[in-house]
Amino acid sequence: MRKFLFFASIFLYTCDIPTFEVDNPYDPQNPSYVAPSVTINSGPIENEIITTDNVAFTWIGNNETMTFRYFLDGNLKQDWDDISSVLIQYLDEGAHKFGVQGRYPTEDVSDTVFVNFNVNAVLGPSLLFYPRKHDAVIGEEVTFQIFAEEVIDLSAAEFTINYNTTLINIESITQGDLFKTANQSIFYVDQDPLQDSFTVLTAILDGISPSVSGTGVLAEIVVKINSQGTSNITFSGVNKFRGPNNTAIEIREKIGGIVIAK
C-alpha cells in the first residue's frame, strides 16, 4: 500500500511539470524562450521637431523570422508583413505618434514601441490644406479645412482653388472660424464649375477688433469622389492676405490638398 501511494504521488507530481519542445525557441514554456521585441533604429527621436512633411523610420526585431505592423496617430497603417522600414509622406503640421510592433511565427506579439514627434514644415504666414491628404473610395465625401498659418494682424484673405471635376466635385464651401470671432465679417464664394475652380473672399468688418493673429480656419470644403486616381487641389492665380489698413501681407507658402481614390 505504501509503495502504491509513493508511485501515485510521483505520477501526480510529474503531471504538474510543464512540458515544452526543447528545440523550439518560440515555445513560451521553454526556459530559453525570449519574448519578441522591436527596436527603432532610425527616425525622429522622442519629441523631436522635424521641418519636412515626410519622415522615415527603420526598425529591427530580436528574431529574423518576425513580421511587423506600424501605426500613426493611433491608426493602423500597415498590417502584419515582412517590413522593416517605412516612408510616411504628407504629414500635417503638429504632433504625431508613430508605433511599431513585432510578431513571432507563433503569433506571440511584442510590446508596441512608440515615438512622439512634431512637424513644423510650414513657415507662416501661409495658406494650407488640412489634412494634406485624404485616402477615399468612389462616392465618399471628405472634408478639407483651409488654414491661415501663423498670421499677424490679418484682416482679409482672397484665394483661388483649382481642382479636376473628372475626379472630384466640390459639394460645399463654408466659412471657417478664424474671422467668426469678429462681430461682423463677410464670406463670399465665386464658383465656376466650367473652369474647375472657385475663389473665396473673406474679411473682418469689425472696427473694434479689425484683425486676428495666429493660426485658424478660413474656409471648409466638402469634396465628393467621382472616380479613381490622384486628385490635386491647388492654390492658383492671385492669392492675397491683407492687414487692417489694406496693407499687403506676404504669403510665404501655399500648400494644397491631395485626394487618392481607390
Regions picked out by a protein language model, each given a short descriptive name:
Residues 2-7:
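Sec-dependent signal peptide recognition
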Residues 11-14:
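C-terminal motif of bacterial Sec signal peptides marking the signal peptidase cleavage site
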Residues 16-125:
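Low-complexity, disordered linker/stalk regions enriched in Pro/Thr/Ser/Gly
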Residues 16-18, 120-262:
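Acidic, low-complexity intrinsically disordered segments
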